[in-house]
């Protein structure tokens, strides 16, 4: 990934710009007329890595989400509450889908998978 580029003429920031005639990526100074060809066509890359536990922490009220299915066929190992919401997601480093449960006890919110 490239870092910020600066103009060789006036030391201001170079901004990505398309040369429409040649269909190439350039970096151009907005202060002077300096331009240079980009050595890489990637201007910005955003990689997002979240584990399922991070996703359920982001959704702190996941147990009260009315769109998620609920079951009374499981029992929480932490508080013995008999109701949980469940959803499927891919676990990090695993292929296929995994079934995740979140305890519906508002004082617990324990998460586990099967």
Curated annotation (Swiss-Prot):
GO biological process terms held by the UniProt record: DNA-templated transcription; gene silencing by siRNA-directed DNA methylation
Main localization (coarse): nucleus
Localization of this protein: Nucleus, Nucleolus
Disruption phenotype annotation: Shorter siliques and ovate leaves with shorter petioles, smaller trichomes, prominent leaf veins and changed cuticular wax coating. Loss of methylation at RdDM target sites. Partially redundant with NRPB9A with respect to Pol II. Nrpb9a and nrpb9b double mutants are embryo lethal.
MF (Gene Ontology): DNA-directed RNA polymerase activity; nucleic acid binding; zinc ion binding
Zinc finger (TFIIS-type): 72-113
This protein's UniProt keywords: DNA-directed RNA polymerase, Metal-binding, Nucleus, Transcription, Zinc, Zinc-finger
SUPFAM superfamilies in alphabetical order: Zinc beta-ribbon
GO cellular component annotations of the record: nucleolus; RNA polymerase II, core complex; RNA polymerase IV complex; RNA polymerase V complex
Keyword presence, Ribonucleoprotein: no
UniProt-listed Gene3D superfamilies: 2.20.25.10
Binding site for Zn(2+) 1: 7, 10, 29, 32
Recorded family membership: Belongs to the archaeal RpoM/eukaryotic RPA12/RPB9/RPC11 RNA polymerase family.
Further facts: The loss of silencing in nrpb9b mutants is due to a defect in Pol V function, but not at the level of transcription. Pol IV functions are not impaired in nrpb9b mutants and Pol II functions are partially complemented by NRPB9A.
Name this protein carries in UniProt: DNA-directed RNA polymerases II, IV and V subunit 9B
Taxonomic source organism: Arabidopsis thaliana
Gene it is expressed from: NRPB9B
